[in-house]
């Protein structure tokens, strides 16, 4: 059975607390120290940048799975939520919520009366 996770697509833009964010997906993402990272949240630039690969050596890169890429997006998105609430960047909160969100999208089920409804996006169904 196809899940919400299977249907989920990372957006190019979204708005949180009145601030529009741009989402950039790149092969490799590096932080301010030039270290490779899974993703970055920049409240000053209102951007989230997500990596698709992680350098192992100078000539070898690990390809992230969809699970890793989507989890990284949610992790950085939850940084934007937390920043809007209290101007902090708590890693443990962002990662916990990202894990919960991915689990939710993978396990959400619908009663049989809603099965078979077609939608291009999982959240725009009419009831």
Model-derived segments and spans:
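Metalloprotease/metallohydrolase-associated module, dominated by Zn2+-dependent proteases
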Residues: 1-67, 84-127
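Active-site recognition of the HExxH zinc-binding catalytic motif
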Residues: 71-83
């Amino acid at each position: 059975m196809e899940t919400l996770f299977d249907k989920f697509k990372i957006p190019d833009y979204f708005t949180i607390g009145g601030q529009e964010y741009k989402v950039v997906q790149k092969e490799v993402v590096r932080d301010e120290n030039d270290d490779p990272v899974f993703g970055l949240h920049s409240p000053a630039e209102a951007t989230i940048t997500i990596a698709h690969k992680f350098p192992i050596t100078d000539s070898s890169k690990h390809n992230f799975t969809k699970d890793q890429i989507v989890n990284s997006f949610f992790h950085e998105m939850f940084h934007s939520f937390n920043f809007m609430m209290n101007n902090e960047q708590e890693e443990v909160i962002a990662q916990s919520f990202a894990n919960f969100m991915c689990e939710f999208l993978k396990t959400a089920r619908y009663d049989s009366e809603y099965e078979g409804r077609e939608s291009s996006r999982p959240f725009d169904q009419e009831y």
